[in-house]
Design a protein with these regions (language model features):
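A cross-family signal for key residues in well-ordered alpha-helices
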Residues: 9, 132, 145
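Hydrophobic alpha-helical transmembrane segments of polytopic membrane proteins
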Residues: 175-189
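Residue-level signature of catalytic and energy-coupling elements of molecular machines
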Residues: 15, 33, 66, 84, ...
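Hydrophobic membrane-targeting segments
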Residues: 1-55
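Internal alpha-helical transmembrane segments of multi-pass membrane proteins, especially GPCRs
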Residues: 12, 16, 22, 126-129, ...
């Protein structure tokens, strides 16, 4: 408890600039934790929706039934289901034009799925750049507060005739709190960023694999009246 109070006292006695730096870093830390929690829940939902659709896709349900379900459930569909829907939509549009070259039809569907994939990946990666910025910049902001605080402490000692460690230590300690808060903001952001980046890479690989598998299915069904074969 005494240690907590001493830290509070250090913050209260710090210069205005150092206090502003501390307040900024604390605000950034709160925003960072909010972004981390949102990303945890959103990635969990993305994985769950992708797994659910993938099970349904390989269960034997016809492609037309899957497309109808995707259109009906558009607001709540996951990335994989939306990619599937965009591919099926483009596939059917090109087939209606009675294009003889089936490769052109499949390539068009694949391009539509790749475009949808990029949109989904951009959405999943949202807030990652913020976490990266917090992790890389916060320590330097804290260091700026520390340097400023030390300069302020030594400036205040200029008028003293005798300077001892007991005289200098409080000012330096006040300044070092800024660096500590900067690290407190940066470390969770860096750890979360690395974890999310790995998880998103796995999601991206899974979606790309699905695009290739579905493209092969469309290739086999390009000449059929009602594509359904796996």
């Amino acid at each position: 408890m005494n240690q907590d109070m001493s830290i509070v006292q250090l913050v209260l006695h710090a210069s205005v600039v150092v206090q502003a730096v501390m307040l900024l870093l604390l605000a950034v830390s709160v925003m960072s934790w909010a972004a981390i929690l949102r990303k945890i829940f959103s990635l969990k939902k993305v994985k769950s929706l992708n797994d659910e659709f993938e099970r349904e896709f390989w269960s034997g349900t016809s492609l037309n039934e899957l497309q109808a379900a995707a259109m009906q459930n558009a607001k709540f569909a996951g990335p994989m289901e939306r990619i599937f829907a965009s591919g099926m939509r483009e596939f059917q549009k090109l087939r209606e034009r009675r294009i003889v070259d089936h490769g052109v039809v499949v390539d068009g569907a694949r391009r539509a799925m790749r475009a949808s994939f990029q949109r989904e990946l951009d959405a999943v990666e949202s807030n990652l750049s913020f976490l990266a910025s917090v992790g890389s910049v916060s320590p330097y902001v804290g260091l700026f507060g520390t340097v400023w605080g030390i300069m302020h402490a030594f400036t205040g000692l200029a008028s003293l005739q005798q300077v001892t460690l007991a005289t200098v230590a409080p000012g330096i300690a006040e300044a070092l709190v800024a660096t500590a808060i900067g690290l407190f903001a940066a470390i969770p952001a860096v750890v979360a960023y690395n974890r999310f980046a790995r998880d998103i890479d796995r999601v991206a690989i899974k979606l790309e694999t699905f695009i290739e598998e579905f493209s092969n299915i469309l290739q086999r069904n390009a000449g059929a009246q009602a594509p359904s074969e796996r």
